[in-house]
Structures are given as C-alpha cells and as structure tokens.
Amino acid sequence: MFFERHSGGERTILVHLEGQDPEAREDPQEFQELAISAGAETVAFFNVPRHRPTAKFLIGSGKVEELRDLVKVEHIDLVIFNHILTPSQERNLERVFECRVIDRTGLILDIFAQRARTHEGKLQVELAQLDHMSTRLVRGWTHLERQGGGIGMRGPGETQLETDRRLLRVRLRQIKGRLEKVRSQREQSRRGRSRADIPTVSLVGYTNAGKSTLFNNVTKSEVYAADQLFATLDPTLRRLELDDLGPIVLADTVGFIRHLPHKLVEAFRSTLEESSNSDLLLHVIDAAEPDRMLQIEQVMVVLGEIGAQDLPILEVYNKLDLLEGVEPQIQRDADGKPQRVWLSARDGSGLELLEQAIAELLGSDLFVGTLRLPQRFARLRAQFFELGAVQKEEYDDEGVSLLAVRLPRIELNRLVSREGLQPMEFIEQHTLQ
C-alpha cells in the first residue's frame, strides 16, 4: 500500500454522535463491527449527544477534555469517530489527544485496504486512500519521498509539503491510468458476452448479506466468504448453465454500507460497473436482519450513484435458515413476474427457485423482432452489429435498413434512449422471413 495505515490490535476509543433519526440510533452496532473488522481493540465506546457541531473539534470542549484524560489513562493509540471529520478537526483533535484520530471514512478505507486481494482491488483502494488523504498533507508526508520517482524530483527551493503534493499528483495519475486500462478490458469482456448473447446477472446487496456464499453455492465456486464486513472486494465472474434459459454470467461484487464514502464509489467504479451493465440484478437481503429496510434503502442509494437504479431487480431474501416458519418460495407481482425469492445460501434450500426466477425474468425480457432504421441512424445500426444482435438485414424501396435483431430488451432500450427516442419508433410490424 502506498502509505502506512494503522495495524490491528491498537488500543482504541470509539466516538459515536447520537442522532434523532432511527438510522442514527441503529448505527452504533455497525460502527463497532467496523472497528472489529479493522482489527481494533476497543477500550471504550463514547456516545456523544449530537447538538450543534463545533468547527474546531466537531464535539464540545467538555467531551474533548474527557476523552483526552481517558486517552492518557488508558494509553490509547487511536480514536475513531463514527462521523466525517474535516482535516482541521482531525488535526486539532490529534494535538489535544496526542494520538492518531481517524473518521468513519478512514476506518472503512482501512478495512478495504486489508480485504483487497487482487492487483486491481489494491489499486482501487489506494486511489481512494490517496484521494482522502490529499487534504491531510500538512501531517508531513515525508515518506512519499521514498516512493518510486521521489529521488531527484525535488525542484530548487521546493518545500517538503510542495514535494509531497507533487508526488501525490503523480501517483494519482499513475493509478488512474492503470485503472482505466482495467476498465477498458472489462468493457471488451462485456461486449464479447453481449455478442455471444450471454446475459449478465450481478449480485448486489448490503455487506455481509451472504452474496459470496450464494455465489459459491450456485456456481460451485470457492470465492472467499466469511461472516464479516466487506469479505469480498474483488469482482468474480462465473459462467453458469440454467436449464430453462441457457448460459448466463453471474458476477459477485463488493457489498454496500450506510454512508459508503463517495471516494470509494468513485475509486471502485470499474468494479461497480459490472453491476450497472448487467441484464439483471439479484439484490441479496439478510432476511434475519431487523434493520434490513434501512439496508435496502442504502443499497438503492448506491445503485443510483452508479446509474443502475433502473435495471431489473430480483430481491433475494437470504438466511432463511435463521428464521422459523418461513419456507423457500417465489413471490410474484400483480403480473405474475418473480419479484422476490426466499432461500438459504448456507444450506442450499430454495436455490432451484432462484434459478427458475432468473430464467423467467431473462427469458421474458428478450426482444426478438425487426427494427426499421433510416440512414440517419447509421451509428445506431452499427451498434447493433457490434453487439452481435443482428440476425438478418434487408433494405426497403426507400433504402431504409430493416434489421432482424435478438437482444435483451433493456439493451434495446439503452441504445435507443441515447438517441433521445423510444423503441416503438423503430419497431417494424412485419418481421423478416
């Protein structure tokens, strides 16, 4: 990793700002789970009433003094705030406590740094970390000078802070360039799957909802799965044959969480695009979680950030083995389409219902027909050919292209909407023979 992060086992105080809304009241438990996931040794948990935040410390001076005394008595190494701190607040608190202080964003970034396993995942975490820490350079990043390209780069009369900032900008450009190549490779892979008419189904959901366990059971894979937050960061794709549909590609991606740092969403955009470019999303929900409605809302917020909120979604209520009196089942909407599936990824009950629901949704969402494309839509015509969706082409007496196509309806809608039009404006009533 490009810069040092705190190691596990540090003696830690957790500071939570109490709010009035239900979401804030439920947050302390998740905050403690995050700290455990990071490897912190929690010595004390502080609930601070959230009245009027102060510009200097965020919390009142009385609480700051109380925390300072506890830090000294308990020999605390780290204080973590379950709230976003400004760089100046972080520095002011560190001066008073004489120990390290990080906020919720820094904590989540640290967990991601520990969980990343692939080269791409590590680059994405590093990008988010550096972006977050760029506003905190006043701490004195003299260690940046030791990184690749540091020696010999300092200009005459340049301060250490200026050098650190310049080195940071260079490193950020390097990482973004590498991730752009990864993004391009992923796009090529997606185009290849689309040309082969293989739909992509992505697992999304709140962290620790059981996505990777479900993925492993369905695909007979051995992706890392554990009862911990953010066990999976790196996307995994597997080809799967469904009896009533044929081949699909199933993708397992990073889990979401409340107040997921925007920097992480941006850094992991190439990974999250596996979801936003899918034909169907499986929203995995922990059915045994009392707070699941808030978790569902947060997942929808992140899907909105990556442009995936309008994709077809099948809700998958997992962990049925932890509930009593609930059987595996498919629940349908008023039109009879599968809306949610209840199952247990751990013991495998209900998996056949999930496959049935996927086959129903994807099979009914294929468009097979003829499109009428005048010459001014040559670019749109080329895109259908690029996707491998064209089965036959003819021209009418006016030189208008008649394309017999077969592709997911959502893909048709996506391509046509880019032209500011509706699919019905192109659909020919008479199919080609």
Task: Label the predicted regions.
Residues G106-A128:
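Short alpha-helix plus adjacent loop in nuclease-associated cores
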Residues E26-I36, E41, V64, R68-V73, ...:
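Conserved C-terminal guanine-recognition region of P-loop GTPase G domains, centered on the G4
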Residues M1-L14, T135-A209, F215-N216, P290, ...:
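C-terminal-of-GTPase-core extension/linker across diverse P-loop GTPases
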Residues F3, R186, R193-P199, N217-I248, ...:
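Switch I (effector-binding) loop of TRAFAC-class P-loop GTPase G-domains
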Residues L14-E18, F45-V48, I80-N82, H283-D286, ...:
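Conserved beta-strand segments of the P-loop GTPase G domain that flank and frequently precede/overlap
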Residues M1-L109, M424, E428-Q433:
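N-terminal accessory targeting/assembly segments
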